[in-house]
């Protein structure tokens, strides 16, 4: 599939604008994930999907239907499902263009959100320390399937973002330092041949060259430093 970053970014923003302009659903959706990190916390890679938390389970049916209405304005809805843990949609806005996945998580982890504004649109956005915690857990759970989370964890570590250790411990059922040790072990076993899987097309050429050569070892090094600081 072809990825036209300019077009894709425009449609992502239009969907967000429509979503957060709808007062019947906007108070119940917490924006998170890679696109939120790109827009509000300086993440230096492109992001292609939209991720939210559902903040009031009693509004699930209404939110599910309203998001269908929003997404249909921008193309063909190829999928709209209520999965075990999420509301899930796949939007095709052009033939041969990259699809947009929208996922609304229904699980509660005590995450916090604050109002932030992007190009005049106010959105409820997950605070950075909670976002970092969920990114670390995503890397731990999906390592070997996609390296997108590895890049994001490197970004949060490199830029010295705080992390909500309680969320990490709640999700992993491990102490924070034990989870860090596990992540280090997982990365040490990860082949560099797969380090661009799921993230390569979202990086510039120079970023790809750097990631291929350095991402895995730099992330391991920063995790070890973080682990050392916990002692």
Question: Could you tell me what each predicted segment is?
Answer:
Residues 51:
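Acidic Asp/Glu-based divalent-cation binding sites
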Residues 1-29, 43, 55-57, 61-231:
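Structured mid-to-C-terminal alpha-helical surface segments
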Residues 41-47:
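Glycine-rich loop at the start of a catalytic domain that most often binds anionic cofactors/ligands
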Residues 31-36:
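Glycine-rich beta-strand-to-loop/alpha-helix junction loops that act as flexible
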